[in-house]
A protein has these predicted regions:
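FIC/Doc superfamily catalytic core
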Residues: 1-187
C-alpha cells in the first residue's frame, strides 16, 4: 500500500481547513448524530475542538496519550461516565503499530484505525477517537485525510462488522480506495 498523497504538513493542514465543515459533517453522520439529535451541537463543537488541536499541535507525539486526549475532547459533555484506560499491552501494541518505518504512513494510519475499532478501546466514542487519531497521524505525515462520506457510512459499518466478526480485511482496501482524501496538486 502506497501513500496517495505526499504533502507538507502545511499543505495538509490547508486542505483540512478548506474542507473542515464537510469532514465534521461526515464524522457526525458516522457517529450516528442525526440532524434532530439534541447532542449534535455538542458533538460538533467537540469535533471542532479536536481538529483544532490536531491542526495546531504538530509537536504532540502520536501515542496513546494523544489518543486518550482526543477521546476525552470528543466525549466532553456527551457521556461523562465513559472513562477509559489502556493497559500496558495495548499501549505497546499501539506503539509498535505506529512505529514501522518500512511501511507507508497511510497504511499505518488505516491499521491504527482498524486496531482501535477492533479492540474497542473505548466504551463509547471509539469510531470518533480512532478516526481523529488516525487523521492526526495522516496530517502530521502529509498523507491527506481519512473520512467516510455520508453516502458510504452504511457500507463502512457493514465492512467494519465483517472485519470484527470474521477478520475480513477487505475493509482495509475499501478504506484506501474510498476514504482517503487530499488535494489535487498541479506539478
Amino acid at each position: 500500500m502506497i501513500n496517495k498523497f505526499t504533502l507538507s504538513r502545511a499543505q495538509n493542514v490547508r486542505y483540512v481547513k478548506e474542507h473542515l465543515e464537510t469532514l465534521i459533517q461526515n464524522n457526525l453522520a458516522l457517529s450516528r448524530y442525526e440532524l434532530d439529535d439534541p447532542l449534535r451541537a455538542v458533538a460538533k463543537q467537540n469535533f471542532e475542538e479536536a481538529y483544532n488541536f490536531i491542526l495546531n499541535n504538530p509537536d504532540v507525539e502520536n501515542d496513546y496519550r494523544c489518543l486518550m486526549y482526543l477521546h476525552e475532547v470528543l466525549m466532553k459533555n456527551l457521556n461523562s461516565d465513559v472513562k477509559s484506560e489502556l493497559n500496558e499491552q495495548k499501549i505497546e501494541e499501539l506503539s509498535m503499530m505506529i512505529n514501522q518505518p518500512t511501511r507507508a504512513n497511510l497504511e499505518i494510519a488505516i491499521d491504527v484505525l482498524l486496531y482501535i475499532l477492533d479492540k474497542r478501546l473505548f466504551a463509547d466514542g471509539d469510531v470518533r477517537a480512532a478516526l481523529l487519531f488516525a487523521n492526526k497521524f495522516m496530517i502530521d505525515n502529509g498523507c491527506g485525510i481519512l473520512t467516510v462520506s455520508q453516502d458510504k457510512k452504511d457500507i463502512f459499518r457493514e465492512k467494519l462488522k465483517k472485519y470484527k466478526e470474521d477478520k475480513d480485511y477487505d475493509i482495509k482496501n475499501w478504506v484506501y480506495m474510498y476514504c482517503v482524501k487530499g488535494p489535487k496538486l498541479d506539478y
